[in-house]
């Protein structure tokens, strides 16, 4: 009879199970020793086809032949919600509650502490279902103890807290002994609050925001910001615009006709609004360039290094009769005469600042 390789392999598995040996069945020695054996019955082949082999079949047969076997015994092991199996209900551990304490639990804990005292925590935990002795102890000393001081920390307490932390470090239980009525948790939390406050105060962003909130920028100045005894000065402020000085490094000083200085808290440059209205009425443009503390207007460049034209108040409706503003002259240089002003009205030289040429 021809013996196939599959029959030899199945016969080897049956032999190894019968001898309770766990040697690898495909060793060449074992195969040659049992090559003459083969499956004699179809029952052996069915056993080999089952995933558990003949063990599962024999267990099923023994259970069916046992009259005392019942389905209730098969459920002897029970599985809890946590996935753990217990052989009997008597060996199940008590399920401990986790999470926030409920008001009913706090009331029950206060009653038990009043009966057993704040030291028998294991006994109290047996009476309070779902909580351990440690959980009851921490809840009492950190939240429910009537001796807890819940008032805000004073400056003196904060100073002592910082000194104690420099001495003891993060030993909060030891530090809490220096503060009667304060728990170690409250001491630790308030230390972190103080450190966060100090960090915010020393940060540059905090100082910058505080400075801006205390001194907000104002778009227009009032007479109170520029005290000056000259009466013409206030009239000039009411009819002119103010522009912030874009180049504070020039340090231009402002003077009136009578050399009365103008004081400014914000270091601003006063410019008459009608100074540049010549562009609107096709008048000769005035090119003004600034080099250091010098200003060049028209042809008046280099003759007097600190000269500046006296710009009058020009009415757009009457360009032929300009009325000079005697209250104020341009600032930072000496006053110039009428001849300089006439030169300023002439066609000035073109200054090619961008290098684009005349085209």
Curated annotation (Swiss-Prot):
It is found in: Nucleus. GO terms for biological process: organ boundary specification between lateral organs and the meristem; regulation of DNA-templated transcription. Residues 121-143, 172-195 bind DNA. The keyword Repeat applies. It holds the Pfam family Myb_DNA-binding. InterPro entries: Homeodomain-like_sf, Myb_dom, MYB_TF, SANT/Myb. GO terms for molecular function: DNA binding; DNA-binding transcription factor activity. Residues 58-99 are annotated as: Disordered. Residues 63-73, 82-94 have a biased composition (Low complexity). Expressed in organ boundaries. GO terms for cellular component: nucleus. Keywords: Developmental protein, DNA-binding, Nucleus, Repeat, Transcription, Transcription regulation. Residues 93-144, 145-199 form the HTH myb-type domain. Disruption phenotype: Defects in organ separation due to abnormal cell division and expansion during early boundary formation. Failure in accessory shoot meristem formation. Signal peptide: none annotated. Probable transcription factor that involved in boundary specification, meristem initiation and maintenance, and organ patterning. Functions in both lateral organ separation and axillary meristem formation, in part through genetic interaction with the NAC domain genes CUC2 and CUC3 and the homeobox gene STM. May be recruited by a variety of developmental programs for the development of floral organs and the initiation of ovule outgrowth. This is Transcription factor MYB117. The gene is MYB117.
């Amino acid at each position: 009879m021809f013996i196939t390789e599959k029959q030899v392999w199945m016969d080897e598995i049956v032999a190894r199970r019968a001898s309770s040996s766990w040697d690898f069945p495909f060793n060449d020695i074992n195969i040659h020793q049992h090559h003459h054996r083969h499956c004699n019955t179809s029952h052996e082949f069915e056993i080999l086809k089952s995933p558990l082999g003949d063990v599962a079949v024999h267990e099923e047969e023994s259970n069916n032949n046992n009259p005392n076997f019942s389905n209730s015994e098969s459920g002897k092991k029970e599985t809890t919600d946590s996935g753990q199996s217990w052989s009997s209900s008597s060996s199940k551990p008590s399920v401990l509650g986790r999470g926030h304490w409920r008001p009913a639990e706090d009331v029950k804990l206060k009653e038990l502490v009043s009966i057993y005292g704040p030291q028998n925590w294991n006994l109290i935990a047996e009476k309070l279902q779902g909580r351990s002795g440690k959980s009851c102890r921490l809840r009492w000393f950190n939240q429910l103890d009537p001796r807890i001081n819940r008032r805000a920390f004073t400056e003196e307490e904060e100073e002592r807290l910082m000194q104690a932390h420099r001495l003891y470090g993060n030993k909060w239980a030891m530090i809490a002994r220096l503060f009667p009525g304060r728990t170690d948790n409250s001491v630790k939390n308030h230390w972190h609050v103080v450190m966060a406050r100090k960090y915010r105060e020393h940060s540059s962003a905090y100082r910058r925001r505080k400075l801006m909130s205390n001194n907000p920028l104002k778009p227009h100045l009032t007479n109170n910001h520029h005290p000056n005894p000259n009466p013409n000065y206030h009239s000039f402020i009411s009819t002119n615009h103010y522009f912030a000085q874009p180049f504070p490094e020039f340090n231009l000083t402002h003077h009136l006709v009578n050399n009365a200085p103008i004081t400014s808290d914000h270091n601003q440059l006063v410019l008459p609004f009608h100074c540049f209205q010549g562009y609107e009425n096709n008048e000769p443009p005035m090119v003004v360039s600034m080099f250091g503390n010098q200003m060049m207007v028209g042809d008046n460049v280099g003759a007097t290094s600190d000269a500046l034209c006296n710009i009058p108040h020009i009415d757009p409706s009457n360009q032929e009769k300009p009325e000079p503003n005697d209250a104020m002259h341009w600032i930072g240089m000496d006053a110039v005469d009428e001849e300089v002003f006439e030169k300023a009205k002439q066609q000035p030289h073109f200054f090619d600042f961008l290098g684009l040429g005349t085209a």
